[in-house]
Amino acid sequence: MQATLMVALGGAIGSVARYWLALLMLPISRELPWGTIVINIAGSFAISFFGALTLEQGRFPIPEIWRLAFMVGVCGGFTTFSSFSLQTMDLLRAGQPGKALFNIGFSVVLCLIAVWLGLLAAERFNGGIEQVAQNVIEEEAS
């Protein structure tokens, strides 16, 4: 029950942060959903960086409940894959397949790069990218 409450609290924080950032990005989001793109890239970096640093074997290990609160709650509430999907479909339905493909490619590639950069940044704290990657794999398997 405590974990559920922590995830819910994290989700509320992430959702509000997403809303505020999307509002800040509105002036430049006329042609493409830049707020959603930036949010997904930032969330991809945050989940990998925080996740790698806070593993039991990481530089800053923390209790699992706090990892859940941030990774499932905050990052889950903050990132916007459903919004990304809907906005891409809206571009397609508006007869703008080029913009839709750009949105897909740009978002996916930069989110993958953000995850990679998050892992590299965590490497500085944890002592080697191979160890970070192995720790993440082991954590996911358990």
From Swiss-Prot:
Keywords linked to the UniProt accession: Cell inner membrane, Cell membrane, Ion channel, Ion transport, Membrane, Metal-binding, Sodium, Transmembrane, Transmembrane helix, Transport
Transmembrane segments: 5-25, 35-55, 68-88, 100-120
Cellular component per GO, a single term: plasma membrane
Coiled coil: none
Binding site for Na(+): G76, T79
Location of the protein in the cell: Cell inner membrane
GO molecular function, one term: metal ion binding
GO process annotations (BP): cellular detoxification of fluoride
InterPro entries: FluC
Domain of life: Bacteria
Reaction it catalyzes: fluoride(in) = fluoride(out)
Regulation acting on activity, per entry: Na(+) is not transported, but it plays an essential structural role and its presence is essential for fluoride channel function.
Membrane-protein topology: Multi-pass membrane protein
Function, as annotated: Fluoride-specific ion channel. Important for reducing fluoride concentration in the cell, thus reducing its toxicity.
Family, similarity comment: Belongs to the fluoride channel Fluc/FEX (TC 1.A.43) family.
Protein name per Swiss-Prot or TrEMBL: Fluoride-specific ion channel FluC
Species whose genome carries this gene: Brucella anthropi (strain ATCC 49188 / DSM 6882 / CCUG 24695 / JCM 21032 / LMG 3331 / NBRC 15819 / NCTC 12168 / Alc 37) (Ochrobactrum anthropi)
Gene that encodes the chain: fluC
